[in-house]
């Protein structure tokens, strides 16, 4: 996603501002937060944030939710370099890994998972035709995963209500399953 902040401010000015902020507030992270294109989520009233370095991504999402006055039942997704960061990660770690060459961290938010999320996960399942796996997601929300083991484990769907790297619970043997995260 192209940053409007970058378009509106020359590189030298952005870099000087970020360096000044880091010198004055060494325990704060300079963050630019902008709404992603083509989303119906409200626009945030301010783009620049000085975030405590010990704040988690999940806590930052909470701040953004409050700033845009998003209803609790509505989903919000934040992206850093078009990737969903783990909600338990510290903003300082995300900053060190993803800061721009101007020393700002650029975060976009959306009401949809616009970039998708795919990957591999070890799912523990019993040896049966169909297995239900209980998953604990952010804030202890419980969801279920249905795997049709007769079709080479290709029909596994994980549905979680919030952005979160899932923690899987159950017993038995492990198997690798390709999955796509679908957010509701």
Swiss-Prot record:
This is Autophagy-related protein 8. It is found in: Cytoplasmic vesicle, Autophagosome membrane; Vacuole membrane. GO terms for cellular component: autophagosome membrane; cytoplasmic vesicle. Pfam families: ATG8 (PF02991). Belongs to the ATG8 family. A lipid is attached at residue 116 (Phosphatidylethanolamine amidated glycine). Coiled coil: none annotated. Signal peptide: none annotated. CDD domains: Ubl_ATG8. Residues 117-184 form a propeptide. One of its GO terms (biological process) is protein transport. It comes from the Eukaryota. Its main location: membrane. The keyword Lipid metabolism does not apply. The C-terminal 68 residues are removed to expose Gly-116 at the C-terminus. The C-terminal Gly is then amidated with phosphatidylethanolamine by an activating system similar to that for ubiquitin. Keywords: Autophagy, Cytoplasmic vesicle, Lipoprotein, Membrane, Protein transport, Transport, Ubl conjugation pathway, Vacuole. The keyword Hydrolase does not apply. SUPFAM superfamilies: Ubiquitin-like. Disulfide bonds: none annotated. The record marks 116-117 as: Cleavage. It is a lipid-anchor. Ubiquitin-like modifier involved in autophagosome formation. With ATG4, mediates the delivery of the autophagosomes to the vacuole via the microtubule cytoskeleton. Required for selective autophagic degradation of the nucleus (nucleophagy) as well as for mitophagy which contributes to regulate mitochondrial quantity and quality by eliminating the mitochondria to a basal level to fulfill cellular energy requirements and preventing excess ROS production. Participates also in membrane fusion events that take place in the early secretory pathway.
């Amino acid at each position: 996603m192209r940053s409007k902040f970058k378009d509106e401010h020359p590189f030298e000015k952005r870099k000087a501002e970020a360096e000044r902020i880091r010198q004055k507030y060494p325990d704060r992270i300079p963050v630019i937060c902008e709404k992603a294109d083509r989303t119906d989520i409200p626009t945030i009233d301010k783009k620049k944030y000085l975030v405590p370095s010990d704040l988690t991504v999940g806590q930052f999402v909470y701040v953004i939710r409050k700033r845009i006055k998003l209803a609790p039942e509505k989903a919000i997704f934040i992206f850093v370099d078009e990737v969903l960061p783990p909600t338990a990660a510290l903003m300082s770690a995300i900053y060190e890994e993803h800061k721009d060459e101007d020393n700002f961290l650029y975060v976009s938010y959306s009401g949809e998972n616009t970039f998708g999320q795919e990957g591999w996960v070890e799912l523990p399942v019993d040896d049966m035709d169909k297995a239900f796996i209980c998953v604990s997601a952010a804030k202890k929300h419980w969801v279920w995963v249905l795997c049709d083991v007769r079709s080479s484990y290709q029909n596994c769907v994980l549905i979680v209500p919030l952005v979160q790297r899932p923690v899987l619970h159950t017993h038995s043997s492990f198997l690798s399953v390709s999955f796509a995260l679908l957010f509701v």
